[in-house]
Swiss-Prot record:
CDD domains: F-box_AtFBW1-like (cd22157)
Species of origin: Arabidopsis thaliana (Mouse-ear cress)
Keyword Protein biosynthesis recorded: no
Sequence ranges assigned to domain F-box in this UniProt record: 9-55
GO cellular component, one term: vacuole
Protein's name according to its UniProt entry: F-box/kelch-repeat protein At3g16580
Keyword vocabulary terms for this entry: Kelch repeat, Repeat
Length: 382
């Protein structure tokens, strides 16, 4: 009988599971996708946040200078690597004007369109800007109950640049659709009250934006753009706000995959506060979101997390640590680690030559970039 050659994963049946995990943690992420169907155990492993975080090629921040893009790994030491967008037909030197990190993918604003990108998998797709759009600015990604991805952006009306439109790209139809940015719960235009210094946050398929009421004391809250109905409604109040738009740090993020976190640093006192929503966020309107203070750091000589160009810091929370990326007063990028009411460590990123790089948080994932596919017309039933 001829010898039947075994497939690579068949040899793994006799290996200890810990050794299999160690081997897979060294496999390039784009190759892991092919192994998801090997077994339920392997598929569950690739969904495990601990496995992703411990992978040898995991990184948590993206930095962009005028000419290059970099990834920044944190544990066990800081490692900086150059990245490329790899978009066919795109000029290799073109760097995104803006990146939006949301739902384990990155959205890159380019000169004539947007790029949906998973830099960990080295997957990307190009989406043309709408023909009627000028000065388009992306705010986030969502997906509806049919699994279709949607990109949310604001743009100027071509016939009147003083008016802004909410425009939505649907991956199912590969088309942009414009709508008035009206808060359906209050009948008000929301575009002028969006806190534009930070982008949107994607959670459970919907997009959440920080807005405010212009009263004697600014009142901050979240609005929800529902990806299925495309309605815009007030979702909940935030636990705090800021009266110093330019200098205070004020950044919303997703916490533990199913809640919100909010970082605030007062420019005057340098005190840092982290608030998180106490319970999981569901897809129903929940005006009674309860916020709790997760961390407070008020020790002397804390760094100013808002740089000289008034750019907001990037951050994530892990194992009760707050990890922040921001630039100092000279324009050099630094990584700060906070915990137990103190600054634990700070490291300057010397590999990035250019001053004042832009920076974003990134959540590594094996989520493939959705491809635009036009829906075929349904067949007539006779």
């Amino acid at each position: 009988m001829a010898h039947e050659e075994k497939r690579p994963w068949e040899f793994s049946l006799s290996l200890p599971w810990e050794l299999i995990e160690e081997i897979l943690s060294r496999v390039p992420p784009e190759s892991l996708l092919r192994f998801k169907t090997v077994s339920k155990q392997w598929n569950a492993l690739f969904r495990d946040k601990t496995f992703i975080n411990n992978h040898k090629m995991t990184f948590r921040f993206i930095l962009a200078t005028k000419s290059k893009i970099y990834s920044v790994s944190i544990d066990p030491k800081i490692v900086v690597r150059e990245l490329t967008l790899d978009i066919p037909g795109l000029e290799s030197h073109e760097i995104p004007k803006k990146l939006v990190d949301c739902d384990k993918l990155l959205l890159c604003d380019m000169e004539k369109g947007v790029v949906l990108w998973n830099p960990w998998l080295r997957h990307s797709t190009w989406i043309d800007q709408g023909s009627n759009h000028t000065r388009m600015e992306s705010y986030g990604i969502g997906y509806n109950n049919k699994g279709s991805y949607k990109i949310f952006a604001f743009c100027d009306r071509k016939e009147n640049h003083t008016q802004r439109l909410l425009t939505i790209h649907d991956s199912a139809s590969d088309a942009w659709k414009d709508r008035e940015p009206i808060d359906n719960s209050q009948g008000k235009q929301i575009v002028h009250n969006i806190y534009t210094k930070i982008s949107g946050v994607s959670l459970n398929g919907n997009l959440y934006l920080v807005t405010y009421f212009e009263t004697t004391d600014l009142v901050y809250h979240l609005i929800e753009i529902n990806s299925s109905s495309e309605s815009v409604v007030k979702f909940c109040d935030l636990p705090c706000g800021t009266s110093n738009f330019l200098k205070d740090a004020f950044v919303l993020r997703v916490f533990e995959g199913d809640r919100f976190s909010l970082l605030k640093q007062c420019h005057a006192t340098k005190k840092i506060e982290i608030w998180v929503s106490k319970y999981k966020i569901n897809n129903n309107l929940d005006r009674d979101v309860e916020w709790i203070k997760f961390m407070e750091v008020s020790s002397p000589n804390l760094p100013d997390l808002v740089d000289g160009f008034d750019s907001q810091p990037s951050y994530f929370i892990e194992d009760k640590r707050l990890v922040v990326c921001s630039c100092n007063e000279t324009g050099r990028a630094w990584i700060y680690v906070f915990g137990e009411n103190k600054l634990i460590s700070k490291t300057q990123i010397d590999s990035v030559v250019d001053l004042w790089p832009s920076h974003w948080t990134f959540i590594p994932s094996l989520v493939p970039v959705p491809r635009a596919q036009r829906e075929e017309p349904a067949e007539l039933q006779v």
